[in-house]
Design a protein with these regions (language model features):
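Residues that define the transmembrane beta-barrel architecture of outer-membrane proteins
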Residues: 21, 42-46, 81-87, 124-130, ...
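Repeated loop/turn-to-beta-strand initiation elements of outer-membrane beta-barrel proteins
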Residues: 23-25, 57-62, 99-103, 138-148
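Extracellular loop and loop/strand-boundary signature of outer-membrane beta-barrel proteins
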Residues: 34-37, 74-80, 117-124, 150-153
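Residues on the lipid-exposed face of transmembrane beta-strands in outer-membrane beta-barrel proteins
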Residues: 29, 48-52, 89-93, 109, ...
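Outer-membrane beta-barrel strand-turn architecture
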Residues: 19, 51-56, 95-99, 111, ...
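Transmembrane beta-strands of outer-membrane beta-barrel pores
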Residues: 29-35, 44, 64-70, 95, ...
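Cleavable N-terminal export/targeting peptides
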Residues: 1-22
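Predominantly the C-terminal beta-signal and adjacent terminal strand-loop region
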Residues: 67-73, 128, 138-171
């Protein structure tokens, strides 16, 4: 029974390969937030995305964001400007639906960098962590879509999250 179930699943995934396969690019905006004991901070970032649809169910993605607006927090009597940037590599698992809304989950590894500026001095720290999230894409056509996703990572002492709105273009 297990062999039959496995064979049916593999056959279903293989037949879907012809309908969804290829390169896609995305660009959008993200709200990147981090929380450490005693501090919360975030930034507004521009986001770039590159991915490859293996089939209707599986895609591989790379993502990069750069801060365009940083947060300001007060530590003791000093104002600190702080922002977070990230890059990640993900496997995206899509639930095929009959309509234009395609929900998905993704998981992978992310590397984040937080930089704090006081006056003319900037200090940066970076770390890598397992990252996971959920989202959905609204397919406007076979070539374009808009997606909204939430991704989280735990960097030990720091918890981080990314809420992104991205336009997707398929080739």
């Amino acid at each position: 029974m297990l062999r039959l179930s496995s064979a049916v699943l593999i056959a279903a995934m293989a037949t879907s390969t012809a309908s969804a396969e290829g390169l896609y690019l995305g660009a959008g905006f993200a709200s990147v937030n981090a929380e450490e004991p005693g501090y919360k901070y975030g930034s507004t970032n521009i986001l770039g995305l590159i991915g490859y649809e293996v089939n209707d169910y599986l895609s591989l993605e790379g993502e990069l964001s750069v801060a365009i607006s940083k947060d300001k927090i007060r530590i003791a009597s000093t104002n600190v400007e702080i922002g977070t940037e990230h890059m990640g590599a993900y496997a995206k698992l899509t639930l095929p639906t009959a309509g234009p809304i395609k929900p998905y989950a993704r998981f992978g590894m992310a590397r984040a960098e937080a930089s704090a500026t006081v006056g003319s001095t900037t200090v940066s720290v970076n770390d890598s962590a397992f990252s996971y999230g959920i989202g959905a894409e609204w397919e406007l056509s076979e070539q374009t879509g808009i997606r909204l996703d939430y991704t989280a990572a735990d960097y030990g002492v720091t918890d981080a999250s990314v809420l992104a709105l991205t336009s997707v273009f398929r080739f």
